[in-house]
Amino acid sequence: AYVQAKQSWWEDKATVYAQDEDGAYFLYDMACSAEDYEKLTVGTKIKVTGFKGEWAGEVEIMDATFEIMEGNFVAEALDVTAMLGTDELIKHQNEKVAFKGMTVEAANDAGDAFLYKWDGSGQDGDDLYFNVSYNGATYTFTVESYLCDNTTDVYAAVKALNVGDVIDMEGFLYWYEGVNPHITAVTAGEVASTKSEGVMTYAEYIAAPMDSEVVIEAYVQAKQSWWENQATVYAQDEDGAYFLYDMACSA
């Protein structure tokens, strides 16, 4: 397979994410000198011999040795957003993946957007844990500090997150008691439109001339009055607000 990222090296043991055209591998504590570790650049082809194991759902190759081969391959991140919550997702375990348009959720009852360590007991430089949601389900993602330490762009990006942000991400599809991706990049994502076909955006509504017909979708915030099958209502969406005066409405 081909090296996609190096997580760590310590006492002649390396932990590496590797992938080929068919799938991916997590190489845990593979025998590796410091000199050889420097040779394991992204795309390097290696032949690995070790033992297949599993820990908390993560399938890995342990107690391995390797040799460098001829060849180079860098995987493109596969968008697996739509696979979240399905049996299809685990088939891509350890691959380089992407998630698009996910919403940052509170990481704890205090409303923080991320935690140092899984329980919030850590400090700057430790792993970052944060929650993101898609289609009503919430997932915990991680910035693994051995892979991306506190000097990296992704570490800073996660520390700058706010609850409610919509983000795109890339990383490796790690598993720990369920999906727990190791994230390597975070960027601002696009908010998916929730408006029906033919409905104006707030910007289009503002630009519309007076006395022209408009079609909007919004959420009722308060009812001012009702009289003779006419209602006056305050409505709002994520982009702006509307005053609906004497709108036709039965009791």
Per-region residue spans from a language model:
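OB-fold single-stranded nucleic acid-binding module
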Residues: 2-251
